[in-house]
Amino acid sequence: MLHSSAMVNSHRKSMFNIHKGFYCLAAILPQICICSQFSVPSSYHFSEDPGAFPVATNGERFPWQELRLPSVVIPLHYDLFVHPNLTSLDFVASEKIEVLVSNATQFIILHSKDLEITNATLQSEEDSRYMKPGKELKVLSYPAHQQIALLVPEKLMPHLKYYVAIDFQAKLGDGFEGFYKSTYRTLGGETRILAVTDFEPTQARMAFPCFDEPLFKANFSIKIRRESGHIALSNMPKVRTIELEGGLLEDHFETTVKMSTYLVAYIVCDFHSVSGITSSGVKVSIYASPDKQNQTHYALQASLKLLDFYEKYFDIYYPLSKLDLIAIPDFASGAMENWGLITYRETSLLFDPKTSSASDKLWVTRVIAHELAHQWFGNLVTMEWWNDIWLKEGFAKYMELIAVNATYPELQFDDYFLNVCFEVITKDSLNSSRPISKPAETPTQIQEMFDEVSYNKGACILNMLKDFLGEEKFQKGIIQYLKKFSYRNAKNDDLWSSLSNSCLESDFTSGGVCHSDPKMTSNMLTFLGENAEVKEMMTTWTLQKGIPLLVVKQDGCSLRLQQERFLQGVFQEDPEWRALQERYLWHIPLTYSTSSSNVIHRHILKSKTDTLDLPEKTSWVKFNVDSNGYYIVHYEGHGWDQLITQLNQNHTLLRPKDRVGLIHDVFQLVGAGRLTLDKALDMTHYLQHETSSPALLEGLSYLELFYHMMDRRNISDISENLKRYLLQYFKPVIDRQSWSDEGSVWDRMLRSALLKLACDLNHAPCIQKATELFSQWMESSGKLNIPTDVLKIVYSVGAQTAAGWNYLLEQYELSMSSAEQNKILYALSTSKHQEKLLKLIELGMEGKVIKTQNLAALLHVIARRPKGQQLAWDFVRENWTHLLKKFDLGSFDIRMIISGTTARFSSKDKLQEVKLFFESLEAQGSHLDIFQIVLETITKNIKWLEKNLPTLRTWLLVNT
């Protein structure tokens, strides 16, 4: 799964501790080998203690008290029939689950949520007591755990197979989970309905009763009944269609490979598709609503190239004969990797050359690469439990880098990947962060695991490990991991083992030597030892939270190194600082270069302090070469002065990514109280000579951040001087920008950012040009093709008049391009009139003109503006209960709404206001991790202003 960030630019102690053992039933059932990682008691039966178990909805005792399912009954195969009615907006369904019983039991526990069970029966071909068809079962329901219990009249016997048949029905969901309805508007204005599934992480149980945990892998045979005007899609190819009475059709699909329930998918719609064949014969199809079929061609081209790449890179063929990618009009996340039927938000799959910018193209390519990587990481090899969600999400995010670089080098994603790491450092440098791998049991806790730590930090430590091991060894290791655990589940240690012993069978059959390959000298560290070495190093990154700070002090030819925990908003002089540093130690794979040599030196820092000797005297040392390491670097003494001097004299002597890293680190260190703000601002002087777009954008992003912070606080003297400084120093590069789509991807992204900044600062030439283009666009009735990279800027300037704002809202409703709608919605949110902003929010809540899927991002962008910040926050407080009816408590949307409307506050009054609101929620969410993150972020903002406001004011007076 990937969360959408297109409009904003942009997952306890276990209640059920299973002692993991290994058993295999092959000896008893030679025709079946079911190997799993469970241990079970000798039998399951009712407790005589009436207080030991919860109470079912009918008042009887429910026979199971844990959140996790018992492992005594293992699903092997589901026969699932579904008939959705797109008129009455409900569905009827039935299933027959083949299960294997490992120990005697009186009950079967499954997951089920909001389903009406109308009948349940049991049959067995191996147990004589259940050979007669239709032995009816009593069904108990315990909604608090989203579980049902099927009570059997006589104990099920060990090592026998049974068939559980269940009939059930439900309404199609109004939200974005389970089996739900989505709508779209045709060019002619007609509203049409489709039925779609989205099951990750714990919503398959909303569509059919099942063993809804990733460890319970099974095969699925799916049948879908539909009307003739619709098509049905599922994970596997359709094998036949049966005509029924009344004009209905029933599609039967091939049985799936063995997989987890969260990957099951089926859709009934009237979409059209374009198709192609990969070099290995896989049919790839892109589906979209009929009027948007012309926007699917880039996705098809990219999918074919990326699937071919992954098959070669992983040395494993994609195991299905087809792969469908479909753009869903209502979709909460960016995309979902259902095996063979990947679902996408429209902005993550469709590309319209007339309205999609360079950034849009990069986003679509990344999301496709991410979801295709999941067909191996996540689908073929699945984490044992959601605490290790990073094993699939971190890898998929990392594989975006590898795959996009290989297939579309012109998109220059290698440079952009730095932002993936910089984004998560903001959160990971707070004390309220969490380890990558963290216990999660409830559905809400599991949903909270889908966050920047699992995705971005997971990807960044994998990139660091690849740089440490070397590309070839790392690739061999992940190939071994995928081959060894295909169609199975894995945990952290399994990955470290594969990366430590990355010998493939081919290495030995060809007579190769793997464990001490002499070819791997550039990145292979001679002291990298056995299995425990990689595990020992990487557990310091996955099992403890936070990010290390490397403190470097140069003394002649000697470097004194020290590692600390890097914390934003907690300063060394604060009383709590020392306690927050205790027990934190990372094994950091360091890299560094010097002014005297381009050679990349390597060292692992395993202790709190260490000393390195340089071979020759050097004027400066730069650690974390190309920012491949996940750590911040602080140069004590004259270290920063020497680097800033070098940037001003000849910045090209430092590598482009190193310049980006220096800008990032220097401003991060200001937030941690380790550097004064004037030192960081002095570094920005060199940017007027910078030609690397990533470095320019990194520096500008901090200056723009400070400007908007002052603007929101109405500190007008500083905001005006910052505006003057920005236009004074960057006017030449702003004025060089053409209002076109010319140049490389980075040229185009720089153009968008610079012109947006110029118009935000009311730079007269920018406002004049944007106004001119907007007027021409209105006069052409929206037919004029404005260059895509400046489209958002033109719309934003146009939205500042009443006529322009109203016209944009009309065009938003009419547009057939989701990329254009995103740009229009952003522009509408920049209005300075609060009644217009409130109208947008109300339309988002209603969900007709502005789809509810966009509400969280809309509130986020509105809150970024001075006129919208308090408005958005007040709306959230007043409508919290209504918001929880639209989005799950721990969902990405709720977390974005909370952080987006509060995290920019920077006063003690607002901190208290937010804190009191969170405390008032109690069961409605006061326990969410995001609340502590927000409170700490606001505190950090307050301390930043207290410490740096006088310095910023003085520095600007001197430099403008």
UniProtKB/Swiss-Prot annotation:
Residue ranges of the TM segments: 21-40
Glycosylated position list: N85, N119, N405, N650
Cofactor-binding details, from the entry: Binds 1 zinc ion per subunit.
Entry keyword RNA-binding: no
Cytoplasmic side: 1-20
Mod. after translation: N-glycosylated.
Gene3D superfamilies: 1.25.50.20, 2.60.40.1910, Neutral Protease Domain 2, tricorn interacting facor f3 domain
Superkingdom to which the source organism belongs: Eukaryota
Recorded GO MF terms: metalloaminopeptidase activity; peptide binding; zinc ion binding
Marked site (Transition state stabilizer) residue numbers: Y455
Enzyme kind, highest EC tier: hydrolase
Stated family: Belongs to the peptidase M1 family.
Protein known as: Endoplasmic reticulum aminopeptidase 2
Species assigned in the record: Pongo abelii
Annotated gene: ERAP2
